Amino acid sequence: MSEHSNPELPPLPYDYDALEPHISEQVLTWHHDTHHQGYVNGLESAEETLAENRDAGDFGSSAAAMGNVTHNGCGHYLHTLFWENMDPNGGGEPEGELLDRIEEDFGSYEGWKGEFEAAASAAGGWALLVYDPVAKQLRNVPVDKHDQGALWGSHPILALDVWEHSYYYDYGPARGDFIDAFFEVVDWDKAAEEYEKSVSHFE
């Protein structure tokens, strides 16, 4: 395995019960300690398989391992952003340059939010607000699993996990209630930071 590949589970940036009543301590514990850890483990295992195959010159299992890298790698990266995109003191609406860009690209904050909620309702994995460096604009992207439907080259700035393990214990089949709850704890400062990072890099 490359010396640069050393995936680790990051700690939550808040206590496990900090997002209650919107997301329960139990769900955060399962989600972070079991599900996210599983993607970290899967990524590490797939990287090890690829390294072993290169050393042995036997690539029979490499295609499956490469698929596991993208699945688990995207799961790891998106979960890391998802935790950072929430805060016990979050909520409200974006401000400053990010709000200006949302209004420019979507017509209004309400126009963006309605489209994002539609993506979150339809996706089989994630709803993402991304910066598209080719078109130089923000886009909402519904992603199945962790890596199906992603837009090449885009940089996620806001991630909402809509896998059932994210909400079913708290909300049952009412995904819409979970989406509403996310907006009660969303950290727009983190989203603005990711947006500014994207613009400075690509523009």
From Swiss-Prot:
Positions bound to Mn(2+): H31, H79, D161, H165
Alphabetized GO MF terms: metal ion binding; superoxide dismutase activity
Nucleotide-binding keyword on record: no
Record's catalysed reaction(s): 2 superoxide + 2 H(+) = H2O2 + O2
Enzyme class: oxidoreductase
SUPFAM superfamilies linked to this entry: Fe,Mn superoxide dismutase (SOD), C-terminal domain, Fe,Mn superoxide dismutase (SOD), N-terminal domain
Keyword Secreted attributed: no
EC number: 1.15.1.1
Cofactor field: Mn(2+)
Pfam families in alphabetical order: Sod_Fe_C, Sod_Fe_N
Keyword entries, A-Z: Manganese, Metal-binding, Oxidoreductase
Note on how the cofactor is bound: Binds 1 Mn(2+) ion per subunit.
Similarity comment: Belongs to the iron/manganese superoxide dismutase family.
Function statement: Destroys superoxide anion radicals which are normally produced within the cells and which are toxic to biological systems.
NCBIfam families tied to this protein: Superox_dis_Halo (NF041312)
Protein name, as recorded: Superoxide dismutase [Mn]
Organism taxonomic ancestry: Archaea, Methanobacteriati, Methanobacteriota, Stenosarchaea group, Halobacteria
